Amino acid sequence: MSDQFSNAQHQLDALGLRCPEPVMMVRKSVRRMDDGETLLIIADDPATTRDIPSFCEFMDHTLIASQTDATPYQYLIRKGL
């Protein structure tokens, strides 16, 4: 895991969950965070490669990094822009 991912302030394990559960859990987790805090999401649902970037764009959060070459996928988001 790169330093970028290991420095996340919060982590969400969405392994084994299928659409729409991962994004619902991300939304719930982000709601409890302060603006500027980061969340590492670990998932294996291929739909997250589309859903998490779309969620960030729609909800005005920043997708800092993603690793989707192999499972488990990793996404690092920051609450707010």
From Swiss-Prot:
Q: Is Cytoplasm one of the keywords?
A: yes
Q: Name one GO molecular function term.
A: sulfur carrier activity
The record's section on InterPro entries has:
Sulphur_carrier_TusA, TusA-like, TusA-like_sf
Any one GO CC term of the record:
cytoplasm
Give the UniProt keywords, A-Z: Cytoplasm
Q: Which Pfam families match?
A: TusA (PF01206)
What the entry lists under CDD domains is as follows: SirA (cd03423)
What subcellular compartments does it reside in? Cytoplasm
Q: Which domain of life is it from?
A: Bacteria
Report the family membership: Belongs to the sulfur carrier protein TusA family.
Role: Sulfur carrier protein which probably makes part of a sulfur-relay system.
For this entry, the protein name equals: Sulfur carrier protein TusA
Q: Which organism is it from?
A: Shewanella piezotolerans (strain WP3 / JCM 13877)
